[in-house]
Amino acid sequence: MKKNILLIRTALKALILHKSRSLLTILGIVIGIASIIVVMAMTQGATNLIVSEIKGIGGESFEILPGKDPKGPSDFGNLFTESLKKRELDAITNKRNVPFIKEVSPNVLVPGSVSFENETFSPTTFGVGEVFIRLLDINIGKGNAFSSGDVRSKSQIVVIGTEVAENLFGNNNPIGKKITMKNRKFTVVGVIEKTGAKAFLNVDKLVLIPYSTAMTYLLNQDFYNSIWARADSPENVKTAIRDVEITLRDLHDIEEGEDDDFHIQSQEEALERISTITDVLSILLVSVAAISLLVGGIGIMNVMLVS
């Protein structure tokens, strides 16, 4: 017992005599532990944020994209193929092919800015179907959304987000006003409620127009950038996806063993990918932080051995 007390006193004296070395060693331990805690907290926070964004589109929804599923940078060029057109849309919406599908919205991206009188704003503009607002689960605060009739007649109308409305019209009511996009006039028929970020989109910066209008008057293209779909229930999502895959493979004459010229992303698949990425990232960052902790621990051992 006396021997242990003597050793402790000797060690304390050594630590006191070498204050700077002891302080730096303890600092290394503190930084190491703090780094691990911070890294784990940040990784978990980022994961929760991403998961909430993915879940924002609803468990019944999935997205059909052109090109094969990219596995690396060399595959991203396949995303710009023209494999999704009206015949694909008609085949997918045919209940005999995909009985469990409830709603479908073709989507096209429209680059460029919008303007009103002397004000100009750069939004995120999509040409979409009338069900897109329901698919994204957002609400109209003023005015109305466009209808299936507007899509069929290629109406030159828009629904805008609150940030777009504020930048172009200030405190004035935008309903009925005409904004300019690519030298064409579009009438504002609705303003989306202030929503913020959802499904990786800043809803407040959105401009939505009928996809038929966008493809005819703004883009001069006959293909879609993607097709959003919703199954009639979460239990039928996998069945609906399988039916879509079978339908498109048959339509495109893809033989067994050949790669698809399209790919489908569901909420479940996205969550699995995010989980894998964040797990690997977490292990990597925690390992780096643990090195600092190990170095500090070795320093403490050296001081104790010297003392």
Predicted regions and their residues:
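Interfacial "coupling" helices/loops that link adjacent transmembrane helices in transporter permeases
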Residues: 18, 298-307
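Short aromatic/hydrophobic contact patches that present stacked aromatics
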Residues: 30, 39, 226-230, 263
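Mid-to-C-terminal secondary-structure elements
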Residues: 126, 130-146, 155-255
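Short, strongly hydrophobic transmembrane alpha-helices
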Residues: 20-48, 296
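Peri-transmembrane interface segments
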Residues: 228, 244, 255-289
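Hydrophobic residues within alpha-helical transmembrane segments
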Residues: 12, 23-30, 179, 284-290, ...
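N-terminal Sec/SRP start-transfer signal
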Residues: 1-31
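Hydrophobic, regular-secondary-structure patches
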Residues: 44-124, 167, 215-216, 239
